From Swiss-Prot:
Induction: By chlorohydroquinone, hydroquinone, and 2,5-dichlorohydroquinone. Gene3D superfamilies: 2,3-Dihydroxybiphenyl 1,2-Dioxygenase, domain 1. This is Chlorohydroquinone/hydroquinone 1,2-dioxygenase. It catalyses: hydroquinone + O2 = (2E,4Z)-4-hydroxy-6-oxohexa-2,4-dienoate + H(+); chlorohydroquinone + O2 = 5-chlorocarbonyl-4-hydroxy-penta-2,4-dienoate + H(+). The keyword Oxidoreductase applies. Pathway: Xenobiotic degradation; gamma-hexachlorocyclohexane degradation. Keywords: Aromatic hydrocarbons catabolism, Detoxification, Dioxygenase, Iron, Metal-binding, Oxidoreductase, Plasmid, Repeat. Changing residue 162 to A: Loss of catalytic activity. The gene is linE. GO terms for biological process: catabolic process; response to toxic substance. Signal peptide: none annotated.
């Protein structure tokens, strides 16, 4: 199979169907020290829900964890094969003991220190909805500048994403897609894990695959407790269009049209492994809020400004920071 030009640059954002907005704030902001950089609404379905964005100071690509708190919709998703199963953050070398103690103080059940691909890490789950997280020790060179959080000292703060892990039953077809269509390069194996990287790797440049032949497929619908999609960065709309054209030419035709998401432009493709990938062009978060005010107000489409208060009452999902 023909290998395409290297158009995908790295991890952009991860989007997760969670439980409650306050549960997300309690974990992402008050425990992990991220900034709530944007509060918007998601309008699909019978009732609106929040779409929340967490990251570093300006929500740079490679730091963005976005959530749909969907508990009120009453549908719980099933985690399983064909999904992102863990989101891993970078932490400075020597800080895992601090993070372990901090998580325990915050009533988060956390693992002992483990090692994979020669790197030490902790694993834990979102206390409110069960989605998987890891904190991995890595040199801070070339990593993202952390948000100056009142909850986490800057010297131990998380510095954007290290990697994401996809759980699959098999990897043959997904391996071909990632190498030939998504320009990921195999980096080696550790047990049932296969590592891939963009370019030479580094912060927000790594994707791991965990093979579990017995794991049942997870659900694709937007249900509480599962990662909905994994978004990857591309430089601009022309690169995005060329990527779609060429990947479809390889036979991977399950692509969406371009979607304007307010803060990025997106196309989606269902991969052979079942994981929903997105190619995302960054537009930024400061066109409707100043940098110092990011995340302070709920933002809605202009045509909905007149009914914003009514929508918020309908959601009935208050946030206290």
């Amino acid at each position: 199979m023909m290998q395409l030009p290297e158009r995908v640059e790295g991890l952009h954002h991860i989007t997760v169907a969670t439980g409650s907005a306050q549960g997300d704030v309690d974990l992402l902001v008050k425990t992990l020290g991220q900034r709530l950089v944007k509060k918007t609404m998601f309008y699909d379905g019978a009732r609106p829900v929040y779409h929340l964005y967490f990251g570093n100071e300006l929500g740079e690509p490679g730091t963005l964890y976005t959530t749909f708190p969907v508990r009120q919709a009453g549908y719980t998703g099933k985690r399983g094969a064909g999904q992102i199963s863990a989101v891993s953050y970078n932490a400075p070398v020597g800080t895992l003991s601090w993070w372990q103690e901090h998580l325990i103080k915050r009533a988060v059940t956390v693992s002992e220190v483990r090692e994979r691909f020669g790197q030490k890490y902790l694993s834990f789950e979102h206390p409110d909805c069960g989605v998987g997280f890891e904190i991995i020790e890595q040199d801070t060179d070339g990593q993202f500048e952390p948000w100056d959080s009142p909850y986490v000292p800057k010297e131990v703060a998380l510095r954007g994403f290290h990697s994401w892990t996809a759980t699959l039953n098999r990897n043959e077809e997904m391996d071909s897609f990632m190498r030939n269509a998504w320009n990921l390069k195999p980096q080696g194996r550790d047990g049932n894990y296969q590592r891939y990287a963009f370019g030479n790797g580094g912060a927000a440049k790594v994707l791991d695959v965990y093979i579990d032949e017995d794991e049942r497929p997870g659900t694709w619908a937007l249900g509480e407790g599962q990662v909905h999609h994994a978004a990857f960065e591309v430089a601009d709309l022309d690169v995005q269009a060329a990527l779609k054209f060429d990947v479809e030419g390889l036979g991977y035709t399950d692509f969406s049209d371009r979607k304007h998401r307010g803060y990025f432009e997106s196309i989606y493709v269902r991969t052979p492994g079942g994981v929903l990938f997105e190619a995302s062009v960054t537009l930024g978060f400061t066109h409707d809020e100043s940098p110092e005010k990011l995340g302070s107000e709920v933002k809605v489409a202009p045509q909905l400004e007149g009914v914003k208060d009514e929508l918020l009452r309908t959601m009935n999902d208050p946030i206290v920071i």
